[in-house]
Amino acid sequence: MTSSLSRPSGRRADELRKVALTRHYTKHAEGSVLVEFGDTKVICTASVAERVPEFLRERGQGWLTAEYGMLPRATHTRSDREAARGKQTGRTQEIQRLIGRALRAVFDLEALGPRTIHLDCDVIQADGGTRTASITGAFVAAHDAVSTLLAAGKLERSPIVDHVAAISVGVYEGTPVLDLDYAEDSRCDTDMNVVMTGAGGFVEVQGTAEGVPFSRAEMNALLDLAQSGIGTLVQLQKDVLGLRHV
């Protein structure tokens, strides 16, 4: 890492923002979490419905799906609610599909049974990394929803087969860095979002050069940073869920 690097936040190149996962944040949902990555704050809820989409009828398996949204003043300037505009943006659709894919990657859908877990991720304050924060928090909310089903005797075993978490990395002022905030994300040379399982498998890698192409060496460095950061996030998930020894 470049010792002369000066990140706007003062963090080291390989340093996460302060991350917090607060469980049972809302009253009604089977699982709910406030996830905080520095100044990025997202409420993630997991709601159980005893039905599945039409395309899964008679298949004997469950489903996880996600919706994502931002409050009008989650950013520096107010934006209209998508409901008021009458349609979702392409960005919103992309992010909520990503969240759903990430969670389904670590669920045994047959073990879930013919029911759906709806994940709702609502950004109340955005400072970069909202999609990766949403995935990391949504897993904890989904885990609590599964615990509710187990306690009610609706599941014979947990359908969760592994943890999943996500983080952003990028090349900022020529140096690979971990967990971009908005000040870095808006000025970085390369931006990458990485989703991984607790076992170290890759679920998704989204990488884009913002003008200057990145090298294979830089990509490897970014993936190494992401793997390290996600390892820390998975351990935090285990800690807040009381699974320290899992």
From Swiss-Prot:
Its EC number is 2.7.7.56. Phosphorolytic 3'-5' exoribonuclease that plays an important role in tRNA 3'-end maturation. Removes nucleotide residues following the 3'-CCA terminus of tRNAs; can also add nucleotides to the ends of RNA molecules by using nucleoside diphosphates as substrates, but this may not be physiologically important. Probably plays a role in initiation of 16S rRNA degradation (leading to ribosome degradation) during starvation. Homohexameric ring arranged as a trimer of dimers. It catalyses: tRNA(n+1) + phosphate = tRNA(n) + a ribonucleoside 5'-diphosphate. GO terms for molecular function: 3'-5'-RNA exonuclease activity; tRNA binding; tRNA nucleotidyltransferase activity. HAMAP family: RNase_PH (MF_00564). Keywords: Nucleotidyltransferase, RNA-binding, rRNA processing, Transferase, tRNA processing, tRNA-binding. Coiled coil: none annotated. Phosphate binds at R91, G129, T130, R131. One of its GO terms (biological process) is tRNA processing. Belongs to the RNase PH family. Pfam families: RNase_PH, RNase_PH_C. This is Ribonuclease PH. InterPro entries: ExoRNase_PH_dom1, ExoRNase_PH_dom2, ExoRNase_PH_dom2_sf, PNPase/RNase_PH_dom_sf, Ribosomal_Su5_D2-typ_SF, RNase_PH, RNase_PH_bac-type, RNase_PH_CS.
